[in-house]
Amino acid sequence: MRPDPGAQDRRRQGGLHLRIVLEPDFHAVRAALTDALDGLDYLRLSEEERGRLEIVLAEALNNVVEHAAHAGGIELRIAGTGRALRCAVIDDGTPMEGEPPDRTTPPDPFRPGEGGFGCFLIRSLADDVRYVTRAGRNRLSFRIGLGEATLH
């Protein structure tokens, strides 16, 4: 995992910008989650906001490790905008087929194989969820709304 050395400087200059590059394995995902959440400590997120962010980031990053074979590096970006965090998970692995499942359609728990629960959680807990593949790069982006925390 390689945190962006300039991220702290950009945060001090106005706005929040975190960038973490990690290898596609579950231990690196855990470390990246810790680094990302530690980097947001100064926002004093509520327990609910922090938990929601952690679940969505964990699902997104773990989905890349599980499903995007030969993903190479994974890049996590978090930018603060007003009362929200804009997040992006970028990789060059195997693209997802079709659109992520809609939040209004929960997966069938009795269907064999992958159930799509991770995508359903992401859609349920985040806003403005978008997935695109361009020039061999996959990008999942989403927004996490914040209550009292305001980013300047």
What are these regions (language model features)?
Residues 1-20, 24, 123-152:
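Flexible, glycine-/charge-rich segments associated with ATP-binding catalytic modules
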Residues 34-58, 111-113:
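Conserved short strand/loop->alpha-helix "switch" segment adjacent to the catalytic nucleotide/phosphoryl-transfer site
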Residues 58-59, 63, 124:
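Conserved polar catalytic motif of the HATPase_c/GHKL fold
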Residues 68-72:
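A short, flexible helix-to-loop-to-beta junction within the catalytic ATP-binding CA
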Residues 73-83:
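Short beta-strand/loop element within the Bergerat-fold HATPase_c
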Residues 86-114:
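Glycine-rich/acidic phosphate-handling loop/turn and adjacent ATP-lid/helix
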